[in-house]
Amino acid sequence: MTRALAGLAAAAAGMLALPAAGQAATTFGSRLNHDPANSGECMRPPNPGPCTLVSFIHPIDPNGDPYSGGAPVSGVITKFRIRAFGEGGAAATVTFRLADISRPDPNNQNSAVATLVVDGPTVTIPASDPMATETPILEFPARVKVSQGNHLALDGTNVWATVNNSGDKFTYVFQPPLVAGQGPRGSTDNAGELLVQADIEPDADGDGFGDESQDQCPSQGTTQGACDNTAPGVSGIAVGARSLRYRLSEAASVTLKVQKARPGRRVRGKCRRQTKANRNRPRCTRWVSVGKSFSDDGDAGANSKNIPRLLRKANLAPGLYRMLITARDAAGNETKRSKRFRVR
């Protein structure tokens, strides 16, 4: 007999209305076009109790052909949907999960091997409503990283979340539930289609937030708000006998170079080394690096860095020099500043 969920109970549980998936999202899993039927695998005798339901096959549009490839792309699952209810007049607590699953023998549909990949949100599925005409689709927010090929899974006890007909072997039951860090485990207990669906959004910067609905700046992994396009400010540069002092407006990685002034000639907009061919070109000053560059992890505010021994003033030949500072913040914004000094 078809059972359903109370819409009012769903709203009270904090579930979202079911919107259309955004254009940038990829939806995979069940088409959710059936009510749960002949389900309740976790409560089957002789050992009723918690279990993990791992989907292996889902029918796909347009013709309902069986698909066993799991997630078609990598990214972040930002929402998932379940068509289910709690049996026995009680609400069901379920946990959204991802697993890797395969059939060791492709010709044997009776057994599969699975490994838990990650746990997602734990949510409450209201009890069945015998007066309702169909089971509504429940949608929940999430933020779960997914890799291409991962399969949808659900942990529960008194939950009806599959549709079983015609002997379909689309989902495998693991009892007790799969455990994080545990190796592959086999199962010969199977069921029909798992009524779970998920939306995957791209995650271009790899920060674990969906680029469409959760991340305002998909190009910078250090922020999920507005993009940081402000370069760090560099000021107060002072080159001492043994150390360098400077100030930063924000924390930044700093690269430092000592460069010496050399005479040059301007050729096609650049200051080149003087040669016989360009000796009549306009004069200019070119800066030539001395020794190796060195670096510092600069903090916001005042900073001090020891200068390598070979680059200290006492060990430099007389002439005009500059300290070139390049500061790059966590978002990749860069500022270059220099401070001239003379060695006599």
Which residues fall in each region the model found?
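C-terminal segment of classical bacterial N-terminal signal peptides
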Residues: 13-23
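Beta-sheet-rich sandwich/jelly-roll-like modules and their strand-loop junctions
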Residues: 22-115, 121, 129, 141-151, ...
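Aromatic/hydrophobic beta-strand junction motif of beta-rich domains
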Residues: 80-84, 243-250, 256, 307
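Beta-strand-rich extracellular modules
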Residues: 155-157, 326-330
